[in-house]
Amino acid sequence: MAKSARHVTGKAPSSLDAHDRKKSKKKSSSMCVGSMFKSAVKRISREVSPDNNIMLTSNSIQVLCGISYDFVDTVADLAGELARKVGKQTVGSDDIISAFEILLKGELRKLAIREVHNALSKSQAKSRGK
C-alpha cells in the first residue's frame, strides 16, 4: 500500500523573506531619553497659549524634554539622598518637598511645593473614593 503524501498544516508561508523582514522593522528613535515628557510639554504649551500663538519645533520640544528630564532626575536624586540620610528605603512626599526647598528659590519654590500638595490631595481623594 502506497503511503499518501503527508499534508502539513500550520501557518501560511510569509510573503516576506528574511532580508525583506529586516528592512521592514521599525527603526528605533534616536531621540533623547527625556522624550517621555513630550506630551506634557505639548499640553503645557497649549495651556500657556490657547490660541496657538506659540508653535514649537521638534528640536525645541526635544530641548524642553531634556530640561524636564534633567530637573526630575535632579529632584529624584536629591530626594533619594535625603531619604538615605534619614535611614529610609523609600522616597516619600516629604523627601520630595525637602528636595524642592533645597533646589529652588523664591516664587518657583512656592509654586512647586503648592503643586506637590495639590497632587497629594488629589491622590488621597482618589484613594478614599475607591
Swiss-Prot record:
There is a cross-link at K122 (Glycyl lysine isopeptide (Lys-Gly) (interchain with G-Cter in ubiquitin)). GO terms for molecular function: DNA binding; protein heterodimerization activity. Its main location: nucleus. It is found in: Nucleus; Chromosome. InterPro entries: Histone-fold (IPR009072), Histone_H2A/H2B/H3 (IPR007125). GO terms for cellular component: nucleosome; nucleus. Keywords: Chromosome, DNA-binding, Isopeptide bond, Nucleosome core, Nucleus, Ubl conjugation. It comes from the Eukaryota. Monoubiquitinated to form H2BK123ub1. H2BK123ub1 gives a specific tag for epigenetic transcriptional activation and is also prerequisite for H3K4me and H3K79me formation. Residues 1-31 are annotated as: Disordered. The keyword DNA-binding applies. Belongs to the histone H2B family. Core component of nucleosome. Nucleosomes wrap and compact DNA into chromatin, limiting DNA accessibility to the cellular machineries which require DNA as a template. Histones thereby play a central role in transcription regulation, DNA repair, DNA replication and chromosomal stability. DNA accessibility is regulated via a complex set of post-translational modifications of histones, also called histone code, and nucleosome remodeling. The nucleosome is a histone octamer containing two molecules each of H2A, H2B, H3 and H4 assembled in one H3-H4 heterotetramer and two H2A-H2B heterodimers. The octamer wraps approximately 147 bp of DNA. This is Histone H2B. It comes from Encephalitozoon cuniculi (strain GB-M1). The lineage of its organism: Eukaryota, Fungi, Fungi incertae sedis, Microsporidia, Unikaryonidae.
